[in-house]
């Protein structure tokens, strides 16, 4: 009985987590749009084996959903360091509520005088 209950609980948690992670489009959709717009190459393998979402002539850009802004800061700086290019973040805003994340990342970058350029894609536009 306990085994069945635990299995049901795990299944319910898994389904709930996957429903909460639902996105309007996958990250790759926005990467492709931005790569075309900025003449960049997608999924470029770095010397350390990680992959930068978009590399342009001047920037190494991390593309991420707005609620992952904190991870985007670190990743963009890592890619920038490895390629000796400017760091960039492209935040995907799926609703007007995501604007708060854009404001937060811009404020932190300004406060700490980080050299990261921030762009946003508003999925509803």
Language-model features: where?
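Bacterial N-terminal signal peptides
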Residues: 7-16
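Conserved catalytic cores of phosphodiester-cleaving nucleases, focusing on short active-site segments
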Residues: 54-65, 79
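Short, surface-exposed coil-to-beta transition loops
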Residues: 71-75
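Bacterial N-terminal signal peptides that target proteins for export
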Residues: 1-6
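Nucleic-acid nuclease catalytic cores
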Residues: 65-70, 80-125
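Active-site phosphate/pyrophosphate- and oxyanion-stabilizing loops and adjacent acidic/basic residues
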Residues: 32, 77, 106
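Short, flexible loop segments at the rims of nucleotide/cofactor-binding pockets, characterized by
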Residues: 39-41, 64-67
């Amino acid at each position: 009985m306990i085994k069945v209950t635990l299995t049901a609980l795990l299944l319910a948690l898994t389904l709930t987590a996957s429903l909460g992670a639902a996105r309007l489009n996958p990250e790759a959709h926005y990467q492709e749009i931005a790569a075309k717009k900025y003449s960049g190459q997608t999924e470029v393998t770095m010397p350390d084996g990680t992959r930068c979402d978009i590399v342009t002539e001047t920037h190494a850009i991390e593309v991420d959903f707005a609620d992952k802004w904190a991870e985007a800061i670190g990743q963009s700086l890592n890619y920038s360091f490895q390629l000796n290019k400017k760091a960039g973040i492209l935040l995907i805003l799926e609703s007007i509520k995501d604007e708060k994340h854009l404001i937060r990342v811009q404020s932190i970058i300004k406060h700490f005088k980080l050299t990261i350029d921030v762009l946003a894609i508003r999925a509803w536009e």
